[in-house]
């Protein structure tokens, strides 16, 4: 099974993603959640997820900074960025390939 890490500072988003997606149908499981990029980095070290779903705008460390920090150590991780920003150029700064 693929392990998924969800990082968002809105608990309702984390819980909604956990409950609304039929993870097992896609051979996935939500291995953990975090409420900011710093917590996400710590969870990465413990869980070694295959897929990261993260908000862009969070306190302490935003999603873009977290993705930049993990890219060298986890080059094969699949990343999905969540954003409420209308201007997609902000999300493109993540340089996701």
Segments (PLM) and residue ranges:
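A generic structural motif
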Residues: 25-30, 47
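Conserved Asp/Asn-Gly motif in the active-site loop of CheY-like receiver
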Residues: 31-38
């Amino acid at each position: 099974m693929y392990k998924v890490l969800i990082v968002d500072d809105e608990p309702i988003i984390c819980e909604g993603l956990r409950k609304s997606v039929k993870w097992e149908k896609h051979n996935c499981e939500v291995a953990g959640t975090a409420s900011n990029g710093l917590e996400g980095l710590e969870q990465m070290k413990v869980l070694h997820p295959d897929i990261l779903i993260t908000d862009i705008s969070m306190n302490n460390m935003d999603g873009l900074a977290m993705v930049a920090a993990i890219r060298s150590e986890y080059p094969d991780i699949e990343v999905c960025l969540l954003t409420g920003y209308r201007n997609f150029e902000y999300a493109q700064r993540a340089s996701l390939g």
